[in-house]
Amino acid sequence: MAVPKRRVSKTRAAKRRTHYKVTLPMPIKDKDGSYKMPHRVNPVTKEY
């Protein structure tokens, strides 16, 4: 079983975790001008 040889400092652990970001979903402008989330059915036009 893998065990760390030395303790990982708070700074080093934080530097590694900087890439664990949550990306916000970008709304897409539909044909009728309304915005919808990607891969969702538009409630107004009932289109995907």
UniProtKB/Swiss-Prot annotation:
It comes from the Bacteria. GO terms for cellular component: large ribosomal subunit. SUPFAM superfamilies: Zn-binding ribosomal proteins. The keyword Ribonucleoprotein applies. It holds the Pfam family Ribosomal_L32p. Residues 24-48 are annotated as: Disordered. GO terms for molecular function: structural constituent of ribosome. Keywords: Ribonucleoprotein, Ribosomal protein. One of its GO terms (biological process) is translation. Belongs to the bacterial ribosomal protein bL32 family. NCBIfam families: rpmF_bact (TIGR01031). HAMAP family: Ribosomal_bL32 (MF_00340). This is Large ribosomal subunit protein bL32. The lineage of its organism: Bacteria, Pseudomonadati, Campylobacterota, Epsilonproteobacteria, Campylobacterales.
